[in-house]
Amino acid sequence: MATRLLRTNFIRRPYRFSALKPVGPPTVTASTAVVPEILSFGQQQTEPPLHQPNEANHHDIDLTDQARLFASVPTSDLFRSTAVLHAAAIGPMVDLGSWVMSSKLMDASVTRGMVLGLVKGTFYDHFCAGEDANAAAKRVKSVYEATGLKGMLVYGVEHADDAASCDDNMHQFLRTIEAAKSLPTSHFSSVVVKITAICPISLLKRVSDLLRWEYKSPNFKLSWKLKSFPVFSDSSPLYHTNTEPEPLTAEEERELEAAHKRIQDICRKCQESNVPLLVDAEDTILQPAIDYMAYSSAILFNADKDRPIVYNTIQAYLRDAGERLHLAVREAEKENVPMGFKLVRGAYMSSEARLADSLGCKSPVHDTIQNTHACYNDCMTFLMEKASNGSGFGVVLATHNADSGRLALRKASELGIDKENGKIEFAQLYGMSDALSFGLKRAGFNVSKYMPFGPVETAIPYLLRRAYENRGMMATGANDRQLMRMELKRRLVAGFS
């Protein structure tokens, strides 16, 4: 596999010296492997620190002039980043990687070690921040000091199947909060929790079924239900639950109580440490239970605060996203609970479509990408207006879309929002869209990188899912990869001149 990777055309191109032309000032995008190290290829220019935004750029998002960023990226890291991003955009390569990771090759210690070593030296090092919370915190520190980009610490486990695993994962999340607390507040923005890691998926499905049935049948009551905000609207997909579910057994109720305790322990630790907590979203089979747990926790830990501790995630590619957001915000305002929201487009389009089709129902996802963009921008505008009126709302705009960034910049100007007050920030995945991250940063916004960590074997499901989720987006990032290749060519020319 490694040999075939090295023989691909995109790696050969930087060495075709006959095709090289002067590229002038390097207008390149960013590698993610950013370290506080200055390279010297040819003449070195004196420039201000990367994390001091240029005031002249606060009225626009510059996605072309990345010379400052690349000045701190070693050529070896830039080369690896280009290779990894190119490979992640090749569908058959993603399929091959998935097959290898689930094949018998992983049963033999020799081949397993070789595969894990290859993964660690390529995809893992590019998309992950380290093998434990302390290593990830060090990576956050080095990235911030080199670039001014903050970090979101994410323990990269996908799910747990039993109580013991849920407890282990909870302790990992608590250690993550401790690691974040050890950093200067300027270096990090939040930690992220996946409810699927602290509550068995089977129980989340059961709770979601019961919540859907309660919404369908107002006379159907759930004795175990805590106070929460609305998790459905009239346009929400309810086809997952066509018959009345059996009530939770006594054992399931005890498991649910234990899951509530885990998330509340995590929230309490965040509250004590003044570390915001972002709750990740899942597919619509599980999302009602996740929304319920996020909102019930927010009511407990956000009330009477100037800023939220608990943030829930809204997926704008869902048709009902806007309605559910408005309902939740209205209820939060009524209860005087400052609420935080992370706004994403969504990542489960294929699986949502397959499930809906198998049930003879319409997909809960918007028909077109344009409708998803419109929904995202409408939700973004709504949340920015809420955050600007002193209500205490917090907003994390997780997007790789430059047009949404430009709209946010215009809206912030219209509303007179202080872009650096921490109530509104942008986020992109670690290892992706660094050009956008730097453009937004230089425009004056707080910008963070979503930085998962964990042992290589633990992170593999995350890496595979990330590859599948972002295959289309990676393919559309050809311009970024082209600019990275241009920077490699420029350095080679400068090195031989």
Regions found by a protein language model. Name each.
Residues A2-S497:
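Positively charged, amphipathic and often flexible ligand-engagement surfaces
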